Design a protein with these regions (language model features):
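Anionic-ligand binding patches
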Residues: 2-12, 18-219
Length: 219
């Protein structure tokens, strides 16, 4: 049960990335009865959760590690994702290292420059890639220990452009052109991107578990 009621947080997204929080709120808007996504879905900083070191070797391991740690720290249902870009000719790299491919975590511009330079000689026909996401939900037991856990997956396939295009989104959005599209992910509206994105697919697959977890917490 949520004893605070009102606008108290009910769901924590285990990230400090405002772009991811914005995407999750839009995906959840209107999907969970009685949930005010603008006040009750918060990020790790707002919930007072600690930073989590990603020590897993797969997207699923990292997402579960983060969700579990935040659920234990806050006593609330927690969601985490680990996502990245998998480039065919690079054997799936950058993969779990996508956010720090150039060395500094979250330096999108440097990551893009390095990736494009590494692929400069790769012909268009071999520039296939995909955004991959593993999204995890962790619901603590009443004593604060790990309880129910669920992991779902999503993928967005496309090709890598030779130059960044568009100003929307974040990360590698400016260089991935989804299959069947003539625009980059960064040129899509938020609604268009959420409808096809890897993160959108993973979180939509997770929605039934989220709804059930929040319903049980209010019972």
């Amino acid at each position: 049960m949520n004893p605070a009621g009102g606008d108290a947080p009910r769901l924590v997204l285990a990230t400090h990335n405002k772009g991811k929080l914005r995407e999750l709120r839009e995906l959840l808007r209107g999907q969970v009865p009685g949930l005010d996504v603008d006040t009750q879905v918060v990020d790790a900083a707002a919930a007072g959760a600690p930073d989590i070191v990603e020590t897993g070797v797969t997207f699923a391991e990292n997402s579960l590690l983060k969700a579990r740690a935040v659920a234990e720290a806050t006593g609330l249902a927690a969601i985490a994702d680990d996502s990245g870009l998998a480039v065919d000719v690079m054997g799936g790299a950058p993969g779990i290292f996508s956010a720090r491919w150039a060395g500094t975590h979250g330096d999108d511009a440097a990551n893009l420059r390095l990736l494009l330079s590494q692929l400069s000689d790769v012909p268009d026909i071999h520039r296939g890639a995909a955004f991959v996401c593993a999204a995890a939900l962790a619901v603590p037991d009443t004593d604060g220990r790990p309880g129910h856990e669920v992991v779902e997956y999503g993928q967005l396939e496309g090709v890598l452009l030779r130059e960044p295009r568009g100003s929307g989104g974040f990360g590698y959005d400016p260089v991935l052109q989804p299959a069947g599209e003539d625009r980059s992910c960064a040129e899509l509206s938020a609604e268009e991107k959420n409808a096809i994105s890897h993160r959108g697919k993973a979180f939509r697959a997770l929605l039934p578990a989220i709804v059930e977890a929040l319903r049980r917490a209010e019972a």
